[in-house]
């Protein structure tokens, strides 16, 4: 299938927290055979994308050991952190499948982090931004002068 996304975000300039005000995702998965299943697939991919964009950080020690080996250390969004996206469809049946269906559900795993990163970078006036966009990382962009003393002492 095919997909496009757009969103509006707010970045708290004190805490560095990101709030997704509105998220719209449009899918062309050919003929929609089961609307509930399609919505579930899109919503699940969207939740994974929120995690990749804002929460899930692969932390390693200086000797290369993985530090986030449990869910106590590796943050994933819960249903309270995942906003409800607006899901739109356009149906252009595939000529290559018997019922005209195409793939659906995987797209938001890839498009959501990019969409959110572009929105946050635009909100902060940045050319690029690394994922995940944790409050600490965003605070370093918002208040770089305040981060410099901590970096000098090895605290960031």
PLM feature spans:
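C-terminal catalytic domains of large/alpha subunits in multi-subunit enzymes
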Residues: 1-156
């Amino acid at each position: 299938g095919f997909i496009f996304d757009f969103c509006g975000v707010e970045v708290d300039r004190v805490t560095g927290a990101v709030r997704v005000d509105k998220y719209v995702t449009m899918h062309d998965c050919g003929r929609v055979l089961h609307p509930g299943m399609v919505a579930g697939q899109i919503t699940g991919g969207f939740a994974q994308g929120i995690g990749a964009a804002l929460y899930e950080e692969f932390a390693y020690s200086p000797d290369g050991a993985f530090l986030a080996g449990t869910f106590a250390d590796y943050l994933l969004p819960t249903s309270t952190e995942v906003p409800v996206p607006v899901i739109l469809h356009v149906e252009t049946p595939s000529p290559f499948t018997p019922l005209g269906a195409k793939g659906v559900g995987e797209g938001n795993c890839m498009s959501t982090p990019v969409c959110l990163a572009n929105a946050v970078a635009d909100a902060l006036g940045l050319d690029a931004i690394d994922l995940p966009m944790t409050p600490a990382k965003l605070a370093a962009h918002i208040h770089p002068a305040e981060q410099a003393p901590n970096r000098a002492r090895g605290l960031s």
